[in-house]
Design a protein with these regions (language model features):
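Extended catalytic cores of very large enzyme megasubunits
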Residues: 1-330
Length: 330
């Protein structure tokens, strides 16, 4: 084997053991390549067991042979999460997703996607955010406790519960409407504990911090208004997702990947990463931001204003589109 090939082999194997090989508790070691391939292919057999036939088994066995010999490469997400972990959360198969901040479930759905390890592209364009229900002040003496389940659904639902306590309608957890919510994190495994797939638990601190910051964000918006009911602004929705993303250590492997799309006349979003944002709003470092520009509807002055921000701060990016309802992934 040449020195060049030795280097490639070392790089390949180090990446495999760093990000894809599972810890084998029974044998007190990491999986070999062939064991990982076997885990992935057995997952496919389990998923489609009701549709198996001798012909299909023959094809799967041939694919497995090519996979094991590295003549072909399957989905890396299947290699990373393959087995019951992926069968229980099939969104783990996807690298990236995209959606709109136009409904109450958007927030917990985005958190769920991030916890599955998928990147999230999301639009906080004004015509999307306008579809969200208003938020209102909560009753001081009305208190409910939410015990956060030790699961990615539980983590995601905790943000749904928090927002449900503020939304005036269409809450995903209506029983918490108007309540002061106390979060109980006692069910969450401590930092470093092993979780499914041989990964390590991040502990509750990141989640606790994110929920606190999201609550402070909403309370600040309510205090700024003399009205009992107010609308969330695009910058609020953006920061809410950024706080969630800051709490995610997906699968014990990587942080979140996000891209935020916003309206061209949204000055707050245009300036989201200006000045001392990295000190005052470090959570915004979890996203790339892009202004949505509909073709043939952009003036020279609007373009100059956007380019000034890009020149001074490196962001936002810009996306020319035929339709403002098109969305993009990170």
């Amino acid at each position: 084997m040449t020195q060049e090939n030795i280097g490639k082999k070392m790089l390949s194997e180090s990446k495999f053991f760093m990000g894809y090989s599972r810890w084998d508790e029974d044998n007190n070691r990491y999986e070999t390549w062939n064991e990982s391939v076997n885990r992935v292919m057995n997952m496919h057999r389990k998923k489609y067991k009701d549709k198996m036939s001798p012909e299909l088994e023959e094809l799967i066995s041939f694919a497995e042979k090519m996979y094991a010999e590295k003549q072909s490469l399957g989905a890396q997400r299947a290699l990373q999460f393959g087995g019951d972990q992926l069968l229980n959360h099939e969104m783990r198969t996807y690298n990236c997703t995209s959606t709109y901040a136009d409904r109450p479930r958007f927030f917990q759905e985005s958190m769920y996607m991030l916890l599955c390890g998928a990147g999230v592209g999301f639009s906080v364009q004004k015509h999307h955010v306008a579809k969200l229900p208003k938020i209102h002040k909560r009753y001081e003496k009305k208190v409910k406790v939410f015990t956060v389940p030790d699961s990615i659904e539980g983590w995601a639902d905790s943000f749904g519960v928090l927002l449900s306590s503020y939304f005036v309608e269409d809450a995903t957890f209506p029983e918490y409407r108007g309540c002061q919510v106390h979060f109980d994190f006692s069910k969450i495994r401590p930092k470093g504990a092993l979780i499914s797939g041989g990964f390590k638990a991040p502990g509750p601190d990141g989640l606790r911090s994110a929920l606190t910051k999201c609550e402070e964000l909403i309370e600040k918006r309510l205090k700024e208004s003399e009205q009992n009911e107010v609308n969330l602004r695009p910058i609020d929705c953006y920061d809410f997702v950024m706080f969630m993303a800051d709490a995610v250590l997906s699968g014990g492997v990587r942080r979140s990947a996000t891209i935020c799309m916003f309206s061209k006349d949204d000055d707050e979003m245009l300036k989201a990463k200006t000045g001392n944002w990295f000190i005052d709003n470090p959570q915004r470092g979890r996203s790339n931001n892009s202004v949505m520009l509909q073709r043939d509807e952009l003036t020279r002055e609007e373009w100059k204003n956007i380019m000034k921000s890009v020149k001074d701060f490196g962001e936002p990016g810009f996306i020319f589109t035929d339709n403002l309802d098109f969305a993009f992934n990170p």
